[in-house]
């Protein structure tokens, strides 16, 4: 099961919803759950914003995908961290961030204990050239947003779902949208907590047999 949380502190997530969470579940946190994180201080043990989340991931045996505003020196990144059973696998920074944030040049995917996870941060899902990791195959595709529901991002997620044959889950601050492997919006849920079932699918669309060539013709006149 995929549990999504927004507009709630992490301690309250544990207190109010902890009994519902089982090993192998996946938790998605939007940016306001942890807010601004000083990454050097966090990794150096001087702050503990992420420590509780990492320990909870290990104790529960779950994957946690948490959005944040990551601070490194004077630079601020719009980021998402993937934590698998107590291990921070990495951090994805938005490639195309708004003014005031530093953009990244690397699109990351994560080989977790539940399979390959592809993560898109905010508007990055609207750029097809950033889909390469997902198109190469993955089990889960998540798009974590720091805004309310966005029609353009949902439309792009529907196209990505069709292209990959996988479910795509878009989490916004006010809602979550689960899109099936054929690009249909299967469910939209509102509120600070929502739960989705994302079945493993192998829908890849129709396949043309034989070798295909692509030609570009020019006007000779």
Residues covered by each model-derived region:
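Active-site beta-loop-alpha substructure in enzyme catalytic cores
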Residues: 2-29, 101-164
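Active-site beta-loop-alpha junctions enriched in small/polar residues
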Residues: 7-8, 69-71, 93-97, 173
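Cys-nucleophile CN-hydrolase/nitrilase-fold catalytic domain and related Cys-dependent amidase chemistry
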Residues: 9-85, 149-166
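CN hydrolase (nitrilase-like) catalytic-core segments centered on the catalytic cysteine
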Residues: 44-65, 130-197
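Short, structured patches in soluble enzyme cores that scaffold and shape functional sites
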Residues: 68, 82-84, 93, 121-123, ...
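Amphipathic beta-strand/beta-sheet edge segments enriched in Tyr/Trp
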Residues: 74-93, 175-191
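A short, sequence-level motif marking secondary-structure junctions
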Residues: 94-98, 124-125, 191-194
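C-terminal beta-strand edge segments of enzyme domains
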Residues: 102, 109-114, 173-221
